A protein has these predicted regions:
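Mid/C-terminal beta-alpha module of Rossmann-like enzyme folds, strongest
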Residues: 183, 211-271, 304, 316-322
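Glycine/proline-rich active-site loop of Rossmann-fold NAD(P)-dependent oxidoreductases
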Residues: 147, 161-176, 212-224, 247
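N-terminal Rossmann NAD(P)H-binding glycine-rich loop of SDR-like oxidoreductase domains
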Residues: 3-25
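A conserved pocket-lining segment of Rossmann-fold NAD(P)-dependent short-chain dehydrogenase/reductase
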Residues: 177-200
Length: 323
């Protein structure tokens, strides 16, 4: 099949695109051309790369027709964040593709009510990002269930893998938190460190996309989680990272109002986003309908990311030997 991947050089595309090529598909990747994949096996030489500014094309109302004009059988959209953008694309692809797959987010759920959260749980999104993703899901699946563009939405957890910084045990991207755990220094966590994170390796997210592609008859009009098996508490995550380096984590705790004054405004914002969701979503639907099995646990996914940071020199430390 001819497959167009929008935003295919990022976290998910790095793992997804080479597998699509290996399966014999003709792949075109649309991107701004500003970033190379985190890993570049030889199969990328067989990918047709098209440089395009989606935001500019959306503002002109031309992006959907640009994609439709490529004559794809399947379109995989990894970088859509507004209902208007999704609607333009879906309208242009109506009757012209076999499948449209959209990358959503588990943040469509908002704060957890009962865990593990299933795909059919009521939507109570928080903030602009989660609200936007929930609106896109409602729009695309509504179209699909009315016989319109055949769409599926895949909701990843906290994307993790070699090449970028994982969400750390404080719920943000500050490398100093990981460095302090490596070196045995005290790390202060918000509240009691019992809020949860649900990391997932980008390779596993790519795997869900591949299974959705292979099971079109049961995936059109549906959403699927793409998350690691189980969630980690901030405290448990910190203790595990310390153990990788033969240490017992030296942890302290502060109420949110006090803790947030000890970090930058940006780190506090990111942490609050993660704490307020405390995600713990189920993978049962993908296992039951698609036969999907995860390759990485959340902890193994973050271990690989941290190991890559050490290898690259971005995180000074000994060789990582997770226990």
């Amino acid at each position: 099949m001819r497959i167009v991947v929008i935003g295919g050089t990022g976290h998910i595309g790095t793992f997804l695109v080479p597998q699509l090529v290996a399966l014999g598909h003709e792949v075109t990747v649309l991107s701004r051309g500003r970033r190379k994949p985190y890993q570049s096996p030889g199969s990328w030489t067989r990918v047709d790369m098209v440089e395009v500014d989606r935001q500019a094309e959306d503002e002109r109302g031309s992006f959907g027709e640009l994609v439709a004009g490529l004559g794809a059988d399947v379109v995989i959209d990894l970088i859509c964040f507004t209902e208007d953008s999704a609607g333009q694309l879906a309208e242009a692809l109506e009757g012209r593709v076999q499948h449209l797959m959209h990358c959503g987010s588990i943040w469509v759920h908002g704060p957890s009510a009962s865990v593990p959260t299933r795909e059919d749980a009521p939507r109570r999104p928080l903030g602009e990002y989660g609200t936007g993703k929930a609106a896109i899901e409602r729009h695309l699946l509504g179209r699909a269930r009315r016989g319109g563009v055949p769409a599926t939405v895949i909701h990843p957890g906290h994307l993790t893998g070699p090449g970028w910084v994982p969400i750390n045990p404080a719920g943000n991207l500050d490398l100093a938190v990981l460095q302090d755990l490596v070196d045995g220094r005290r790390v202060t966590l918000p509240n009691l460190g019992m809020e949860t994170l649900q990391h997932v390796h980008a390779a596993d997210v790519a795997g869900v996309f591949l299974e959705v592609l292979a099971h079109r008859s049961v995936t059109v009009g549906e959403s699927f989680h793409a998350v690691g098996a189980g969630a980690m508490t901030l405290r448990g995550y910190a203790e595990s990272v310390a153990r990788w380096f033969g240490r017992d984590a030296d942890l302290a705790f502060l109420p949110w109002d006090d803790w947030s004054q000890t970090v930058s405004e940006e780190d506090a914002r990111i942490t609050w986003d993660h704490l307020s969701h405390s995600a713990h979503c189920s993978m049962d639907k993908a296992a039951r309908l698609l036969g999907f099995r995860l390759r990485y646990s959340p902890l193994a996914a973050t271990a690989e990311a941290v190991a890559a940071l050490i290898e690259s020199g971005r995180l000074p430390g000994p060789d990582l030997e997770p226990s």
